[in-house]
Swiss-Prot record:
InterPro entries in alphabetical order: Cyt-f_TM, Cyt_f, Cyt_f_lg_dom, Cyt_f_lg_dom_sf, Rudment_hybrid_motif
Superkingdom to which the source organism belongs: Eukaryota
Originating gene: petA
HAMAP family: Cytb6_f_cytF
Official protein name in the record: Cytochrome f
Signal peptide: 1-44
Subunit details: The 4 large subunits of the cytochrome b6-f complex are cytochrome b6, subunit IV (17 kDa polypeptide, petD), cytochrome f and the Rieske protein, while the 4 small subunits are PetG, PetL, PetM and PetN. The complex functions as a dimer.
Membrane-crossing residue ranges in chain numbering: 295-315
Length: 329
C-alpha cells in the first residue's frame, strides 16, 4: 500500500510543469532552512560554554555558566552514597522556581522560563547506554537527551534550554567505571559538580547585555527625549550632559522604563527595571566507587561476628545450666 502511494506521488510530480516543480523545490529548501535555523537557535545556549571554554569548571570551582547568568538561585543534586563498578545508577537534578512567573524573551515579550544544566562527573563516569537502562529508569528519563560536553569529555554532560514546567526535575542515567578495565580509575570517593540555571542569561559570551538585564545611564544630565524604536519595542533615551553634549542610550524591548522625559539623572543610574526572574546555582555531592571485594569482606566479617556472638550466647546458656544443676545437687 505504501509503495503504491509513493509511485502515485512520483507520477503526479512528473506530470507537473517545470515552474510548479521549481516552486515545490523552493518550498522544500525554505522548510529545511527554517528548521535548521530554529533548531540552531534552540540549541545555542549550551554551545556558548562549549565553544568558549575547554573545561566548564574553573580553577576556583566556579562553573562558567555563572558568567552569563548573574543572579544566584538554588539547585539540588541527589546521587547514591556508593556504587559498584560497571553499575547503572541515576542522579536526580532539581532546579526549583516559581512556575507562575514569566521571563522576558529575546523578542521582548513575556514567556515561560527554560532550564538547563551541566553535570561534571568524575573521570570514567559517563552517560549510561540506553540498552543498559531498566524500563523504570527509561520512564523517569523520558524524552530528555543529554549530550557530552565534548567528544573527549564524556564525563561532562549538558542539556538545555528545555521547558522548565516539564523538566525542573531531571533524572540523569549514569554508569560507573570499572577499575579492572580502566586503569585510570581507583576505588575512591569522588566529587560530582552540578550547575543549573532557570531563565535566560543577562550577558552574552562577548560581554554585551541581553534584554534580560538592567540598563543604566551612561552619562549625567537631563533626559530631553524618549523615542520608541521599532515595532517590537525599545527606546532611544537622549541625555543632554552638563557640558552640552548629547548622549543616546539605547534600551531594547523587554525592560520597563523607570525614568521620564525632563528628568535629571546621574551616571550609572538605572533607566529600567531589572526584568530578570531566573538565576544560576551550583551544587555538589560525593559518591564512593566501592570495591566488591571490600563489600564481600565486610559481609564475611559481619557473618563471623554474628556466629561468634551466637556461640557465646549458647555457651553462656550451657554454663548457666551446669551451674543450676550443681546448685540443685
Amino acid at each position: 500500500m505504501k509503495r503504491n502511494i509513493i509511485f502515485l506521488v512520483i507520477h503526479q510530480f512528473e506530470n507537473l510543469t517545470m515552474k510548479k516543480k521549481q516552486n515545490i523545490f523552493f518550498i522544500f529548501l525554505l522548510t529545511v532552512f527554517f528548521n535548521f535555523t530554529v533548531n540552531s537557535n534552540v540549541s545555542a545556549y549550551p554551545v556558548f560554554a562549549q565553544q568558549g571554554y575547554k573545561n566548564p569548571r574553573e580553577a576556583n570551582g566556579r562553573i562558567v555558566c555563572a558568567n552569563c547568568h548573574l543572579a544566584q538561585k538554588p539547585v539540588e543534586l541527589e546521587v547514591p552514597q556508593a556504587v559498584l563498578p560497571d553499575t547503572v545508577f541515576e542522579a536526580m537534578v532539581k532546579i526549583p522556581y516559581d512556575q507562575q512567573i514569566k521571563q522576558v524573551q529575546a523578542n521582548g515579550k513575556k514567556g515561560d522560563l527554560n532550564v538547563g544544566m551541566v553535570l561534571i562527573l568524575p573521570e570514567g563516569f559517563e552517560l549510561a547506554p540506553s540498552d543498559r537502562l531498566p524500563e523504570e529508569m527509561k520512564k523517569k528519563v523520558g524524552n530528555l537527551y543529554y549530550q557530552p560536553y565534548s567528544s573527549e569529555q564524556k564525563n561532562i554532560l549538558v542539556i538545555g534550554p528545555i521547558p522548565g514546567k516539564l523538566y525542573n526535575e531531571m533524572v540523569v542515567p549514569l554508569i560507573s567505571p570499572n577499575p579492572a578495565t580502566n586503569k585510570n580509575v581507583n576505588y575512591l570517593k569522588y566529587p560530582i559538580y552540578l550547575g543549573g540555571n532557570r531563565g535566560r542569561g543577562q550577558l552574552y559570551p562577548d560581554g554585551s547585555k541581553s534584554n534580560n538585564n538592567l540598563y543604566n545611564a551612561s552619562a549625567t544630565g537631563k533626559i530631553t527625549e524618549i523615542t520608541p524604536t521599532g515595532k517590537k519595542g525599545g527606546f532611544d533615551i537622549t541625555i543632554q550632559t552638563l557640558n552640552g553634549e548629547t548622549v543616546i542610550d539605547k534600551v531594547p524591548a523587554g525592560p520597563e522604563l523607570i525614568v521620564t522625559k525632563d528628568q535629571t539623572i546621574q551616571v550609572d543610574q538605572p533607566l529600567t527595571n531589572n526584568p530578570n526572574v531566573g538565576g544560576f546555582g551550583q551544587a555538589e555531592a560525593e559518591i564512593v566507587l566501592q570495591n566488591p571485594a571490600r563489600v564481600q569482606g565486610l559481609i564475611i566479617f559481619l557473618i563471623t561476628i554474628f556466629i561468634t556472638q551466637l556461640f557465646l550466647v549458647l555457651k553462656k546458656k550451657q554454663v548457666e545450666k551446669v551451674q543450676l544443676a550443681e546448685m540443685n545437687f
